[in-house]
């Protein structure tokens, strides 16, 4: 006679079967509907309130939630004038020893459509090829809400122990979460004391195992404007007399970045890499090898800055980087005349290591760029209003280490969990670490090879998402049954 599991312990096979079935019948259809809504984040759609797309996305997700057959589930949509809407839900625990709450976090706003979609695909029409679901906002981060609730429901369906759970799903993450402090102040009494934060809005090194994200970079930026003339001038007449605004701009950016290597110069943009993270990065590099750079759509003979996977992972997670993401004052090639242009303006985006103070770094960047302008030209750096600090995960408690390993082995054919630092930014994570200093953090996600979030052909790897959902369910069960601290 087989040994009976202790009371409240989830049966792994039943969890996997339930989650897989729910993905086919409930989750995937909801994510398809979400993709069809052009719920562009307010930073890219100043008229978002008039357009109503964010409200549509939030209302659709809330309507789905209200039909989920979970005992005691309560759903509310919070709104206030001028603020993005937010979904808050509560699910009572059952058979749990955990006194603290599990907090699920995610977002329903999206990056803009962008250019370059191929194969007849578009941002706002879902296409499923049997493995990947293409469309904007499916992987980043529309799947997270139904996946989180499905993980809880898998435990309820078999009477397994589950902790009290609350969910906060916002509509402004891609704009730096400007309204989240307000909503958390409103919700604090209802959230309660948090023992575990779950965020599914991050990445994975591959699709062969569960990946725990151990750090995120911060973000800041601004607009750099260089002006040399009031009006454009004949390039034959002015060239060699009037300095090129583009050349001046290059010199200014060289103050920040080594043009030969891409390394950033100011010390304020750097931090020490903890030895534990170096060791984990080496382990991830050994697992991934050439996949670290093979995940990108290289053109021609272009190659990565190095072929050392460990250095690339450290660059992405623990070192700063600079990108020019937009430009004004430069006409399209087809209409470019022989004119020495009066000005060049670019949008500068910086990603910063996890423990760097983003506001202080941005202030120093502005000082460096505006000091002693070449040729006395007009140089103005306008910093972005919203900055976001990075995040470094707290030390894992023994129960979480064991739960992660067991869940990965159960749901990924025996493969153990792996750990990785990610280069993206989730503004809320650092705030939650400060607000709940004793909480553990489960940051993971589906943004692995080929996901291409923010770019063309964004896609959700559905088989991985199903396994991630099952893994989350088993971890929640372990959290509910973990021994209370002495």
Where on the chain are the PLM-derived regions?
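An extended, acidic, His-containing surface patch that forms the Zn2+-binding/catalytic region
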Residues: 58, 97, 206-207, 265-343, ...
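A generic structural motif
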Residues: 139, 230-232, 350-358, 388
């Amino acid at each position: 006679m087989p040994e009976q599991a202790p009371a409240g312990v989830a049966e792994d096979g039943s969890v996997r079967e339930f989650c897989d079935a729910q993905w086919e019948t409930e989750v995937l259809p909801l994510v398809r509907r979400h993709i069809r809504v052009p719920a562009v984040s307010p930073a890219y759609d100043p008229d978002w309130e008039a357009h109503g797309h964010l409200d549509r996305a939030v209302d659709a997700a809330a309507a789905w939630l209200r039909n989920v057959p979970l005992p005691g589930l309560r759903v509310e949509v919070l709104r206030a004038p001028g603020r993005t809407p937010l979904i808050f839900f509560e699910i009572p625990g059952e058979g749990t020893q955990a006194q603290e709450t599990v907090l699920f976090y995610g977002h329903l706003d999206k990056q803009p459509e962008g250019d370059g979609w191929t194969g007849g695909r578009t941002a706002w029409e879902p296409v499923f090829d049997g493995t990947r679901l293409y469309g904007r906002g499916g992987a980043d981060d529309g799947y997270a809400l139904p996946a989180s609730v499905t993980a809880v429901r898998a435990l309820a369906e078999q009477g397994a122990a589950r902790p009290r759970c609350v969910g906060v799903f916002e509509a402004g993450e891609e704009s730096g979460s400007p309204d989240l402090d307000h909503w958390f102040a409103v919700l604090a009494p209802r959230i309660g004391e948090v023992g575990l934060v779950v965020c599914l809005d991050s990445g994975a090194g591959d699709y062969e195992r569960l990946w725990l994200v151990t750090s995120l970079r911060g973000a800041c930026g601004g607009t750099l404007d260089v002006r040399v003339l009031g009006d454009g001038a004949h390039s034959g007449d002015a060239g060699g007399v009037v300095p090129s605004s583009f050349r001046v701009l290059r010199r200014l950016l060289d103050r920040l970045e080594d043009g030969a290597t891409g390394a950033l110069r100011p010390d304020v943009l750097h931090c020490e890499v903890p030895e534990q993270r170096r060791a984990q990065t080496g382990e991830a590099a050994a697992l991934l090898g050439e996949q670290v750079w093979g995940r990108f759509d290289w053109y021609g003979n272009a190659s990565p800055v190095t072929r050392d996977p460990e250095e690339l992972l450290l660059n992405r997670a623990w070192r700063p980087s600079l990108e020019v993401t937009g430009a004004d004052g430069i006409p399209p090639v087809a209409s470019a005349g022989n004119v020495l242009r009066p000005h060049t303006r670019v949008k500068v985006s910086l990603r910063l290591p996890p423990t760097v103070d983003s506001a202080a770094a941005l202030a120093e960047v502005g000082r460096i760029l505006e000091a002693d302008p070449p040729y006395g030209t007009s140089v103005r750096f306008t910093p972005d209003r919203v900055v976001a600090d990075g995040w470094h995960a707290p030390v894992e408690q023994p129960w979480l280490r064991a739960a992660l390993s067991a869940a990965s082995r159960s749901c990924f054919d025996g493969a153990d969990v792996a750990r990785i630092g990610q280069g993206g930014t989730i503004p809320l994570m650092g705030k939650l670490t400060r607000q709940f200093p004793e909480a553990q953090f489960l940051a993971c996600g589906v943004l692995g090879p080929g996901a291409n979030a923010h770019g063309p052909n964004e896609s959700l790897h559905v088989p991985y998402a199903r396994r991630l959902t099952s893994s989350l369910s088993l971890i929640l069960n372990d959290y509910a049954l973990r021994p209370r601290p002495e």
